[in-house]
UniProtKB/Swiss-Prot annotation:
The lineage of its organism: Eukaryota, Viridiplantae, Chlorophyta, Ulvophyceae, Oltmannsiellopsidales. InterPro entries: Cyt_6/f_cplx_su5 (IPR003683), Cyt_6/f_cplx_su5_sf (IPR036099). The chain crosses the membrane at residues 5-25. One of its GO terms (molecular function) is electron transporter, transferring electrons within cytochrome b6/f complex of photosystem II activity. GO terms for cellular component: chloroplast thylakoid membrane; cytochrome b6f complex. Component of the cytochrome b6-f complex, which mediates electron transfer between photosystem II (PSII) and photosystem I (PSI), cyclic electron flow around PSI, and state transitions. PetG is required for either the stability or assembly of the cytochrome b6-f complex. GO terms for biological process: cytochrome complex assembly; photosynthesis. This is Cytochrome b6-f complex subunit 5. It is found in: Plastid, Chloroplast thylakoid membrane. The gene is petG. The keyword Cytoplasm does not apply. It comes from Oltmannsiellopsis viridis.
Amino acid sequence: MVEPLLSGIVLGLVPVTLAGLFVTAYLQYRRGDV
């Protein structure tokens, strides 16, 4: 019963983590560009 929950958590965290890294990199790029 743990695997479905674990896979759900992973599938939920991966996009959020990638989005967070993309946003931080974008903000740093914008801040460094100006």
